[in-house]
Amino acid sequence: VQRDYMAGEVSRDLTTRMLLPHDIVEADREGIIHFHDSDYYAQHMHNCDLVNLEDMLQNGTVISGTMIEKPHSFSTACNIATQIIAQVASNQYGGQSISLAHLAPFVDVSREKIRKEVISEQELVGMEYPEDVLNEIVERRLKKEITKGVQTIEYQVITLMTTNGQAPFLTVFMYLNEAKNEREKKDLAMIIEETLRQRYQGVKNEAGVWVTPAFPKLIYVLEEDNIEEGSEYYYLTELAAKCTAKRLVPDYISEKKMKELKEGNCFPVMGCRSCLSPWKDENGNYKFYGRFNQGGVT
């Protein structure tokens, strides 16, 4: 942390003496404007961003010169996600957000993997389970894997340190309608439920007392199928409210209002509260994940 502060002072000096136009520097000194984050400006780092976790998990990525291929289970996907979070946090100075919807497809990958394992075990002992029993065994093991994966993210984020000596400022986005189909939506609901349960429980401090971790922050989206009592996912909203009452997270976003304000789109803020403006790529598609914020001026 001290090294980061020292580097920041050097950057601030270079920014005011050499990099910024004189009129901008003078306006900042006189209080007409405030040029933010001059302690990082010399290296042209960006502030906060939305991590395109989906692209890196589905198509693979490279970390420290090592090829990371598409994961073959939910728990591995969660582990890779924490590595990506650490690398992103070490190369920017603001917050970052990931979406649980980008992890949801790997629940079914694990489901099929576990099913094959259970069938193999049947053959080993020379017996065959009825289909309903087989499905129940698979789902029980799957829930254990989801618990393990969510716990990996929770504990990795609060225990790892970035290159500037801090834990990553991470926000986790929980948006059911981001799922691509009904099966994936149900799987996403399981991840959201486990995330809320673990946050409600908290983590133990050095004295063994359950406390509220600072990160990751949580954002829960209110939508048509979880806002009304009796709706399919209302139980998640009840759990979220219970969690907020005890742990002060999640924060909430109204899908309906955000779509009114953001040209029909609903997406996470970047870390804390900075929210992107709608933008379309060269193909006319809205793009949010993979974008960042830089050069803030008040």
Segments the model singles out, each with a brief description of its role:
Residues 1-298:
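Conserved catalytic cores of very large enzyme subunits
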